[in-house]
Amino acid sequence: MDIIFEQALFPLFCFVLSFFIIFFTTTRPRSSRKVVPSPPGPPRLPIIGNIHLVGRNPHHSFADLSKTYGPIMSLKFGSLNTVVVTSPEAAREVLRTYDQILSSRTPTNSIRSINHDKVSVVWLPPSSSRWRLLRKLSATQLFSPQRIEATKTLRENKVKELVSFMSESSEREEAVDISRATFITALNIISNILFSVDLGNYDSNKSGVFQDTVIGVMEAVGNPDAANFFPFLGFLDLQGNRKTLKACSERLFKVFRGFIDAKLAEKSLRDTNSKDVRERDFVDVLLDLTEGDEAELNTNDIVHLLLDLFGAGTDTNSSTVEWAMAELLRNPETMVKAQAEIDCVIGQKGVVEESDISALPYLQAVVKETFRLHPAAPLLVPRKAESDVEVLGFMVPKDTQVFVNVWAIGRDPNVWENSSRFKPERFLGKDIDLRGRDYELTPFGAGRRICPGLPLAVKTVPLMLASLLYSFDWKLPNGVGSEDLDMDETFGLTLHKTNPLHAVPVKKRGRN
């Protein structure tokens, strides 16, 4: 009887148990948020995290790690969470899709040491009214299409001076430091736009000192620094970046303040009723904004803005021309093609003008190929997440530092055929430009943080390069063969050749 009773109750017990299981599993509250994983990354050591995995060229280290951990990976540098993206798709997410969330910066220890992060258009967050003012001034008074067109003759004249200097070196059969010569050209272009004066002189060592100072700024900002990962070490300045940046920036500030003081003195002496026939430059516009009870700027703001503009307008342009010349000397057949195109278009006119560049597609391809292999800022300027954000299915937490490794994207064999080869032909017939719309080639960044100096760079670099190729043939000094040309890099905010390129200009018959 008991057995029969148990047999009868057992199915009922199972039914009731099943009912409660189904009821509680289907009616209990569930989290509305899905669990989003962090990007994959290498194992971390206590305290230092992944610092030990980064060598003297972080863009190389990140590229190697991405082969194991994928196009979006997570790293830890001391106390600093870092995400590195290494594909066009991931770059689009960071630079465009989530541009607003990922548009702040994490100032470096050296930048904070001169309070540059509080006034700089590079380091201020876009939510800042000061950033919006400085960005607007740069866009409308410096780099607008109208201003770029208005300074065309200036750029052409400064490049003519470069060619003249090269001609003198050619007559003496002397090798030229390409980096230094093109830096002086870029320096005089930007200094005339800003101050209406030349700051560089091809026959003076002072120009070399100025270049070394600008490079010192870029390296002090871009070099690895223990205090960026462990803020409590900042006062020790273990790598010397704070000391270097303070010394270099103060030398530049002294130059800038000298021009500002001279302009203010000139302004005070000038009769307000007299007609000012001198063409106004950018600093004149800035000084107008320092006047009155509701002044929008002060002179300290101006010198810090000028520091940003000199870095963006000189070192990056000259280093790109140097890399282009180095690649052409390593690939003589490519140089011959570029020169043949230029000779065909320019003929015996004797000079390359900016209006000629649009008729030189192969030259433009050479410039793009140079930016692909040697982007001026290989990791761009790192961004910071203002809030948690999901990128390609992975969670990027608030305050994470985000790098876009444009150097690695430019050499990705999944994106580029024969990715390590210098081959300008890959761009012919393709609508790929440098203006932040094609994420396989974004050397200037994209979105609201795109480099404001891009319009000037895309005019200056091709003009300098075309003029050098039109007026001269080129050879390496001391019998060095093209296959022996050193292409080592030195990492900083700007990517330089470790050993500056020296080449001998050989004047073409009937030129200059």
UniProtKB/Swiss-Prot annotation:
Transmembrane region(s): 3-23
Gene3D superfamilies: Cytochrome P450
GO MF annotations, alphabetized: heme binding; iron ion binding; monooxygenase activity; oxidoreductase activity, acting on paired donors, with incorporation or reduction of molecular oxygen
Cofactor: heme
Subcellular location: Membrane
The organism's place on the tree of life at top rank: Eukaryota
Membrane topology category: Single-pass membrane protein
Keywords for the protein's UniProt record, in alphabetical order: Heme, Iron, Membrane, Metal-binding, Monooxygenase, Oxidoreductase, Transmembrane, Transmembrane helix
A GO term from the CC aspect: membrane
First-level EC class: oxidoreductase
Induction data: By ethylene, abscisic acid (ABA), wounding, lead, dark and infection with the bacterial pathogen P.syringae pv. tomato.
InterPro entries: Cyt_P450 (IPR001128), Cyt_P450_CS (IPR017972), Cyt_P450_E_grp-I (IPR002401), Cyt_P450_sf (IPR036396)
EC numbers for this chain: 1.14.-.-
Sequence positions that bind heme: C451
Keyword Repeat: no
Main location: membrane
Family classification: Belongs to the cytochrome P450 family.
UniProt name for this protein: Cytochrome P450 76C2
Gene source species: Arabidopsis thaliana (Mouse-ear cress)
